[in-house]
């Protein structure tokens, strides 16, 4: 769960710094970590 929070934090910081490439990759990281977290309930 802490990985998701860290990824969201990175996305927000990148957005505030107008670093759009890092923001995009951070959002993708949030989605991937969220999918892994949800998949953990089904295994």
Curated annotation (Swiss-Prot):
Location of this chain's protein in the cell: Secreted
GO molecular function: toxin activity
The entry's keywords: Cytolysis, Formylation, Hemolysis, Secreted, Toxin, Virulence
Any one GO BP annotation for this protein: killing of cells of another organism
Record Pfam families: PSMbeta
Entry keyword Secreted: yes
Chain positions found as N-formylmethionine: 1
Tree of life domain: Bacteria
Keyword Lipoprotein: no
A GO CC term attached to the entry: extracellular region
Family as reported in the entry's similarity comment: Belongs to the staphylococcal hemolytic protein family.
Function noted in UniProt: Virulence factor. Causes hemolysis of erythrocytes from sheep (HD(50)=7.53 mM), rabbit (HD(50)=28.07 mM), guinea pig (HD(50)=4.23 mM), dog (HD(50)=4.37 mM) and human (HD(50)=3.32 mM). Acts synergistically with beta-hemolysins from S.aureus ATCC 25923. Cytotoxic towards human dermal fibroblasts.
Protein name: Hemolysin H1C
